[in-house]
Amino acid sequence: FFQGSTDFGWLFPTPRQYTTSPTRMAKKGDILLSVRAPVGDMNIANADCCIGRGLAALNSKSRSDGFLFYVMKYFKQVFERRNAEGTTFGSMTKDDLHSLQVVCPEPGLLKRYDDIVSEYNKMIFTRSLENQDLIKLRDWLLPILMNGQVKIK
């Protein structure tokens, strides 16, 4: 169960809470967008999950989620500029989200984009998951190495 950007990591959220009665779901691969301050922070769901009111789950009708992710990265800059100018923007509604104007390339160009970018995104996602596993291993090993439970020869 993810409530907002507090649960976000570099690319994937970290589970801190669980629920037995989920109401709003995100599917693996959906873009999780923070719709409460700080508006615009993003992560990618690395498993099917439940989301709270502080998040929106986005995906592309054309299944070009890589393109959508980078378009939303652009909007993150727009949100940050609005915040820097002092405009109150503590939350985003469904209507606000639907009113964002996105220029969508024609399907052939979008497919070519996906053909190139999707392989790089897969590598980034795989390495990010590997890094999470290595961090867990480090956090488990370091204390037992420091207190002498395990010795390295």
Predicted regions and their residues:
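Amphipathic alpha-helical coiled-coil/heptad-repeat segments
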Residues: 63, 70, 74-86, 90, ...
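DNA target-recognition domains and sequence-specific DNA-contacting regions of bacterial/archaeal
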Residues: 1-104
